[in-house]
Amino acid sequence: GPERSARLRCGVHSRPHEPPAPPLPSPAAVAAFLRGLDRRARLFAATQAGDASRGEQALAAVARVFAGDAGQWPLAQWPQQYWRLLLAAPSLRHVDAPQADALLPGIARLAPEPRAAVLLHLVAGLDDEAAAAALGLSVEAYQARIRDSLPRNELGQPDVDVWRAWRAAAQRELER
């Protein structure tokens, strides 16, 4: 009737519009993002997997998945989402004992969950909030996991000298 045609002329529809889908990121943007993470991601995956070749398998699979999914996240969430996907890779969930020539032997000897927490901070460079989100933990639980990963000093406190040594070793490997 006349009411419907008036609504149509005014651009008013009886159904609300769906918001437009976010534009897909360009393949060049995704490639640049992955290139920017490459050194950190390789060290992370090799150390978490306990084996460089299994780490490489995880990186290749995650790059494909990330490239297909990146459009659903704002750019600011890409780092957190990338590390979350990497941690979910089967070859990083079922980890081996570290190889004798592990790049970060002190960290590589940790159990898989604390190893991932330490690597997210020292190698991936994530802050506590992003690292906790990548692991699906609260910030408090993430910080406890880091604390619990450290050996204790003679006073029973987490040994910050070990943390400093791990940080220095990670930095050396990233600068190679």
Language-model-derived ranges and their functions:
Residues P2-L8:
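Extreme N-terminal basic, low-complexity initiation segments
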Residues D38-A46, E56-D96, L104, I146:
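Σ70-family region 2.3-2.4 aromatic/basic alpha-helix that recognizes the −10 promoter
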Residues G55, A131, Y142-Q143:
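Helix-turn-helix DNA-binding helix
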Residues D101-A111, A133, S138, N153:
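Short amphipathic alpha-helical boundary/capping segments
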Residues R109-A130, A134:
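Short amphipathic alpha helix immediately N-terminal
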